[in-house]
Regions:
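Active-site-proximal or metal-binding-adjacent scaffold patches in catalytic folds
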Residues: 1-100, 109-160, 165-171, 175, ...
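Walker B catalytic acidic pair
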Residues: 105
Length: 222
């Protein structure tokens, strides 16, 4: 299998899924394919980021983060540096999940906080990439009481009548979320958490070795 085999994000993710299910010995036998997949994955990410940045006149660099705090993380945006960092474990969650993470972080370049403008920008990017349907976005305000009797004001966004961003507070750090109506999150990981963790550790070791042997020259934090 060569790098050309990984001509789409879907093929990269399918390989990563199968890699997780291999025995430790079989994982080592897939070292060359893992490196090829990683290079192709970076190329696909480059293409998506460049396309969005060109369309919206943005500047953005990106790099992998193979550091310690990547469990459960997907990406981070450093808007003051015009940079995003992506955690390689995203490859185990599906191609549309990767696209969603990237577009989410790109929306943070001009909107650091999870507020109205951010979510509308995020939705617009998803629509431009045809990952969400076109349509009217409407906002609904909801006031609820917490267990201490305080009134909290939440906002939600609907796309074509379907809930798409669920409950964020405009004046706090409470993070809203894209709901299950977003088809990007309909992709469930096809392997267990434990298998995914083992696969991630093996992938990290392979990529570290490839970097040391100068098989990889892409920039990443490790």
């Amino acid at each position: 299998m060569t790098q050309e085999r990984f001509s789409t994000l879907e093929e990269c993710c399918e390989f990563a899924t199968q890699f997780c299910l291999l025995t430790p010995k079989k994982k080592l036998e897939q070292k060359d394919n893992m490196v090829a997949m990683h290079i192709a994955l970076a190329r696909h990410i480059d293409e998506l980021i460049n396309r969005v940045c060109t369309r919206h006149d943005l500047e953005c660099q990106w790099e992998w983060n193979y550091g310690l705090c990547w469990r459960g993380s997907a990406g981070r945006c450093y808007s003051h540096l015009c940079m995003i960092r992506l955690f390689p474990n995203i490859v185990f969650y599906g191609a549309n999940y990767i696209r969603n993470v990237i577009l989410h972080e790109l929306a943070h370049l001009t909107n650091p906080h999870h507020r109205r403008r951010f979510w509308k920008t995020n939705i617009a990017y998803l629509q431009e990439e045809e990952l969400l349907p076109e349509g009217e976005v409407t906002e609904v305000e909801e006031v609820v009481e917490d267990r201490w009797g305080r009134e909290l004001k939440y906002h939600s966004l609907y796309l074509n009548g379907k809930l798409i961003v669920y409950r964020w507070e405009e004046d706090s750090s409470l993070v809203g979320r894209i709901t299950e109506h977003n088809p990007l999150l309909a992709e469930n990981c096809k392997v267990s958490f434990r298998s995914r963790e083992r696969g991630a550790r093996a992938m990290k070791a392979i990529i570290r070795e490839a970097r040391d042997n100068k098989q990889l020259n892409i920039k990443f934090v490790i």
